[in-house]
């Protein structure tokens, strides 16, 4: 699922080329009703839900605090935080329904572990994702649902590209999203092997 149709079609084609069964649907993660629709379509297509990966994110508020607007903060809260909340709220009951356990994988950021200047809303919302993930890991343990949170550093995404032009120091630090990094490899292995994070 993605709000960007071009990215959605690219991901669908890549997965289908690997022989993976695919359901591709447009999703604005900040809309709980859209999450419910996606969940219903996924259950119809696959029979049950085992995992949800919350990977949406927006930068929104780049700049000094005195120039930041409420709208930028609200956008970051809606996408980066509430998108994760809605994803779990809608999918967890469906994972619990089959009684086999499952996974919630939330993608936060190293920015959520410590402040990156001029990115207050991004830092704050990603820190909230880390805290939620830790809370949910305890809350859902008895149901056999594992919760992992990934905190990548700079990855070459649209957020990175918009910041790169403004912040020279980022240029040599970004991960290439087409190459498997150590954190994504570890996450993939945990899920494949059923190892707790």
Please annotate each region the language model reported.
Residues 65-66, 114-121:
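Active-site loop immediately N-terminal to the catalytic Tyr-X3-Lys motif
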Residues 88, 125:
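Active-site helix of classical SDR
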Residues 93, 138-139:
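Alpha-helical segment proximal to the catalytic Tyr-Lys
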Residues 109:
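Residue(s) in the substrate-gating loop at a strand-loop-helix junction
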Residues 142-197:
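SDR active-site lid
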